[in-house]
Amino acid sequence: RESYNQRRRFLLHAYEEMGLTCFEPMGAFYTFPNISRFGMTSEEFATRFLEEEKVAVVPGTAFGDCGEGFVRVSYAYSLDNLKEALGRMERFVKRLDGRE
């Protein structure tokens, strides 16, 4: 349980550092960061992130229309894997923001 809490806190902090908002999950081991500021659908974000950085996230729309503007990220992975994935997400977000 503590390892899940540690990983959840790591993701939430990483999102904050990237300027992404995300509600803290209270149950499952998924986060839903808000990606709406990038002006693309959650499907487009997920597809490009997979193609460009080789990291899979689930488009929020897979969970209904209210999921648009969000992607689902699981933290049921090792902290090392999450660090690698979030490093790639940071690089991707910087490109989308025109900072890289």
Which residue ranges define each predicted feature?
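PLP-dependent class I/II
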Residues: 1-100
